[in-house]
């Protein structure tokens, strides 16, 4: 079972990815993790990627496709894999198809932007322990204070509203077109495309996912 998970940052992809991995025994392939592992292992592609990253440049699509092909040939991908954070753009999706990497299921978790802003900008973190709160969904007992230590809570830079909106804008510009792209691929019978309402409870989304991935 080869799966691509699409959705904006903060849509709840990570939680559902965890569910899919546990349920179906397939690994999650994140391009970031994959790059770090290849660099650490010192593979030819890893060394090439390191050179590019050390120069502060973006790793090319060709290089990433090479790494994906290398990674999915490993034993733990025998039953399939879950691609996370890739492809991000239509040229990457085209390159995957050109390299014979077929996908069984494309899953989109859809959450309106305003809901994502509310979710993410409401997060508060206790820097010392990593405990996470939310001003609406999981508030601390005392506003702005950690339940255990009473110390101040902080907002991660990634969760600040301006940053969240910027990341959403990039998602809509680069990745959202993939929704249409895979819709056409599915219409041609080459993959299955399903969209889920990510504003539902985690359990409800997981249940619907399971019924589609049977």
Swiss-Prot record:
Binding residues for AMP = 31, 36, 57-59, 85-88, 92, 156, 167
Biological processes, Gene Ontology terms: AMP salvage
Q: Which InterPro entries match?
A: Adenyl_kin_sub, Adenylat/UMP-CMP_kin, Adenylat_kinase_CS, Adenylate_kinase_lid-dom, P-loop_NTPase
Give the span(s) annotated as LID.
122-159
- Pathway where this protein functions: Purine metabolism; AMP biosynthesis via salvage pathway; AMP from ADP: step 1/1
Major subcellular site:
cytoplasm
Q: Where is this region: NMP?
A: 30-59
Assigned EC number:
2.7.4.3
Q: A GO molecular function for this record?
A: adenylate kinase activity
Give the record's family classification.
Belongs to the adenylate kinase family.
> Protein name, please?
Adenylate kinase
């Amino acid at each position: 079972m080869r799966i691509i998970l699409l959705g904006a940052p903060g849509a709840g992809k990570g939680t559902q990815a965890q569910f899919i991995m546990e349920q179906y025994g397939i690994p999650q392939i994140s391009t970031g993790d994959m790059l770090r592992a290849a660099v650490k292992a010192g593979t030819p592609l890893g060394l090439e990627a390191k050179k590019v990253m050390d120069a502060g440049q973006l790793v090319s699509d060709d290089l990433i496709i090479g790494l994906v092909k290398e990674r999915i040939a490993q034993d733990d991908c025998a039953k399939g894999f879950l691609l996370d954070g890739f492809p991000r753009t239509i040229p990457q999706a085209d390159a995957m198809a050109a390299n014979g990497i077929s996908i069984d299921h494309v899953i989109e978790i859809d959450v309106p932007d305003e809901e994502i802003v509310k979710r993410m900008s409401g997060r508060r973190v206790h820097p010392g322990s990593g405990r996470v709160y939310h001003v609406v969904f999981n508030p601390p007992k005392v506003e702005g204070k950690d339940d255990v230590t009473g110390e101040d809570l902080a907002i991660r830079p990634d969760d600040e509203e301006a940053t969240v909106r910027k990341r959403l804008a990039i998602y809509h510009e680069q990745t959202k077109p993939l929704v249409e792209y895979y819709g056409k691929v599915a219409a041609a019978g080459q993959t299955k495309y399903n969209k889920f309402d990510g504003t539902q409870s985690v359990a409800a989304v997981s249940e619907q996912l399971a019924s589609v991935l049977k």
